[in-house]
Amino acid sequence: MRFDVPRLVLAGLGGGCGKTFLAVGVVRALRERGTRVVPFKKGPDYIDAAWLSRAAGIPCRNLDVHLAGEAAVVRSLVDHGAGMPKRAGGSVAVIEGARGLFDAMDETGKTSTAHLARLLSSPVVLVVDCTKVTRTVASMVLGCRMTDRRLRLAGVVLNRIGNARHEANIRSAIADLCDLPVLGALPRAAAAAVPERHLGLVMPDEHAAAEESVAATAEVVARHVDLDALLEIAGRAPSLSAPRAPRTPRTPRTCRVGVVRDSAFSFYYPENLEALEAEGATLVFVDATRDELLPEVDALYIGGGFPETQADRLASRPGFARSLRAAVEDGLPVYAECGGAVYVG
């Protein structure tokens, strides 16, 4: 079957160029205009995905070819993007890339953002850090275009622009060398008003002003980026071919699986929780920083996170820790990973 999914990939030349800032701002700004936005993050990253979830108001899905395979990645985009209800403001899937456009696990570029964009036949918008450069920006953009002509490179967003002359010089160079539209220019001063350093480094739940940061980011992006042009580019993406999703029979609820989800343990992929429910589990969410005791459950899932930053809060619940230890010693099945494994250990 073929599915229509308006979509675009926001990519960069490297880490720290402003991809997450732009992606979070675009997602929230479009949402505030009435557009139905479904966010995706290339790769396994939890933190960027959490900020995108906060911006969109719905879970962000990770698209990782290495972990899930190409077919599952396409299926995820179709399952969560093609079913978007029609709205007056339209609908769009926004996919944030990772690292540089062509950076991957090996020298072939497989698993790169470029590989993902080709797999999904998605237009690519390149965000470029313009700090202390002018015409060189155009040469870097041209290099990306020439490295892989199969890419649907559709435009550029300039980040950290110093002044009007700086912007004009770069726009002129890109027009001369690249024949690509500049879709926006984010001033260095405007971006500095938002704690950009936290985006991608700190989970929203640990950020004292997460909502204010997302709102401020959206305001900057809405003022300096052509959102209508982004939607038009996303709408040019061709339909995607994918098999019909298999029907999953409803499984009777047969067990209670505790999931420790709080400020210390927050690294969960929604697909894993959905898979547990599909197999008949009733999920019981637990907060190790607030609950006095572990509730009655048949199994326990403790995901990753940053328990070291919440050590005081975890230590303030000795009764919870004792009840967990007693349950484990009594044979409770526990699956723990990353920070969860550290806590249990």
Regions found by a protein language model. Give the residues of each.
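Helical hairpin unit composed of two closely spaced alpha helices linked by a short loop
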Residues: E292, V297-L300, Y343
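Cysteine-nucleophile active-site neighborhood
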Residues: P307-G345
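ATP-dependent carboxylate-amine ligase catalytic core
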Residues: R2-L120, V128-G155, A164-A168
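A short helix->loop->beta-strand "cap" motif at the edges of active sites that frequently abuts
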Residues: S122, L180, E329-P333
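Internal gly/pro-rich beta-alpha loop/helix module
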Residues: T134-P249
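Beta-strand->loop->alpha-helix junctions that form or flank phosphate-binding loops
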Residues: K41-K42, L180-A190, T282-T289
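Residues that mark the start of a beta-strand
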Residues: R7, T35-R36, T254-R256, T282
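Glycine-rich phosphate/diphosphate-binding loop of Rossmann-like nucleotide-binding domains
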Residues: C255, V259-E292
